[in-house]
Swiss-Prot record:
PANTHER family per UniProt: PTHR43509, SULFATE ADENYLYLTRANSFERASE
Name of this protein: Sulfate adenylyltransferase
GO MF term set: ATP binding; sulfate adenylyltransferase (ATP) activity
GO BP terms, alphabetized: hydrogen sulfide biosynthetic process; sulfate assimilation
EC number: 2.7.7.4
Enzyme class label: transferase
Catalytic activity: sulfate + ATP + H(+) = adenosine 5'-phosphosulfate + diphosphate
Pfam families: ATP-sulfurylase (PF01747), PUA_2 (PF14306)
CDD domains per UniProt: ATPS
Length: 419
């Protein structure tokens, strides 16, 4: 669906509505309601959240997972895992690509009954919210992993998370107390869906492309974003601020590098930088669908989907995350993919290009990837000038110079990143 068709479908001055709802459904308490709920929660039984569950809870709180009202029950878990469809309640039949679940030990689950309230506590002890128990249930973890990640190998970081989670899932509606450290650690870029929607309205943007990133932006990323600017009113560079895998570059370094790129190489008022609180799942195609779905809640009409979106290692083909959008119902969600082919620097063209636009043989191409860039920098290798802008490279070099060589995580080139 083109940006023009989306505008026509939504109305002349509309931003894309939230997924499955006419309005955002944030679950974050404020004011007196928050004070009272926090006071009551101190005397409740507690479930300690994993990092992934904490990020999911915050997304529920800020409306990023609209229209969900909490962690999924067994029927919804099964429907999402097998059919990418919710099966119960007001959201029955709604598209959802990845299960959003809470787990605990069998011992604790045995002590819970429907209707019980349980405090949800971060690993540092902060009470993040409460859940009203609907049910507890066990799952086939290997089945979830095979369906969502297409593998059960525990070398896959997303599979490892699922296999290590608690034995029993706890379903129920939640009330959220906190957005964690994100608003204070990243005050310039951390934004809720309500805040990005307001920003888009102020800029009079109707069609917005989200660019998902967990890396500093190199020349291929810059090229993808500029293609999107030609098609849409604006681009939101949306950085993941939650947990990553070893060897990935911290969010504060990425924030500085991306700001420098925007300030020096993008036209004013065509792009904004924002951040969101999730951890990476590395679910490849399924995660690309989730990325598009919650970007709809943030107000984005499009998601840029390039090579190996949300991938890790060699678990997915370079364009599997594009192909999966053709496998779902066309009305599954409103946010549409901007599918862009393999991009690279061409020495013959003396410019960035793609396999669709460049007539020259592969010997002229310099294929750029975030993994290649991280590997070169972590090993103090020379980085070709066509990999990244010099101002960005300097920020990244400064970061790696601050880490002793023996403390740097090994970066391996496998799968699409090695090509």
């Amino acid at each position: 669906m083109t940006s023009q068709k989306i505008v026509k479908r939504l109305g002349k001055t509309s931003i894309v509505p939230p997924h499955g709802s006419d309005e955002l459904k944030p679950l974050l308490l404020e004011g007196e309601a928050l004070s009272q709920a926090l006071h009551n929660a101190k005397n409740l039984p507690k479930i300690t959240l994993s990092s992934r569950e904490r990020g999911d809870l915050i997304m529920l709180g800020i409306g990023g997972f609209t229209p969900l009202d909490g962690f999924m029950n067994q029927a919804d878990w099964q429907g999402v895992v097998d059919e990418m469809t919710l099966k119960t309640g007001a959201n029955k039949g709604l598209f959802w690509p990845i299960p959003i679940t809470l787990s605990t030990s069998k011992e604790q689950a045995d002590s819970l009954a429907p209707g019980d309230e349980v405090a949800l506590v971060a690993e540092d002890g902060e009470i993040m919210g409460v859940i009203t128990v609907e049910e507890t249930y066990t799952i086939d973890k290997a089945h979830e992993c095979q369906q969502v990640f297409t593998t059960t190998e525990e070398e896959h970081p997303g599979v490892k998370q699922v296999m290590e989670q608690g034995e029993v899932n706890v379903a129920g509606a939640v009330k959220v107390f906190s957005q964690g450290e994100f608003p204070t650690l990243y005050p310039e870029i951390y934004k809720t869906p309500a805040e990005t929607r307001k920003l888009f309205e102020e800029k009079n943007w109707q069609t917005i492309a989200a660019f998902q990133t967990r890396n500093p932006m190199h020349r291929s990323h810059e090229y993808l974003a500029k293609i999107a600017i030609e098609i849409c009113d604006g681009v939101m560079i949306h950085s993941l601020l939650g947990a990553l895998k070893p060897g990935d570059i911290p969010a504060e370094v990425r924030q500085e590098a991306i700001k420098t790129l925007i300030d020096n190489y993008f036209k004013k008022d065509t792009v904004i930088q924002a951040g969101y609180p999730l951890d990476m799942r590395y679910a490849g195609p399924r995660e690309a669908l989730l990325h598009a779905l919650f970007r709809q809640n943030y107000g984005c009409s499009h998601l840029i989907v390039g090579r190996d979106h949300a991938g890790v290692g060699d678990y997915y083909g370079p364009f599997d995350a594009q192909a999966i959008f053709d496998e779902i119902d066309k009305d599954a969600m409103l946010t549409q993919p901007l599918k862009i082919d393999w991009t690279f620097w061409c020495n013959a063209c003396q410019a960035m290009a793609s396999t669709k636009t460049c007539p020259h043989d592969a010997e002229h191409h310099v294929k750029v990837s975030g993994t290649k860039l991280r590997k070169a920098l972590s090993e103090d290798q020379e980085v070709p000038e066509n990999f990244s802008r010099p101002e960005v490279l300097q920020i990244l070099r400064n970061y790696y110079e601050s880490i002793a060589k023996e403390d740097r995580a090994e970066v391996k080139l496998v799968g699409a990143s090695a090509q």
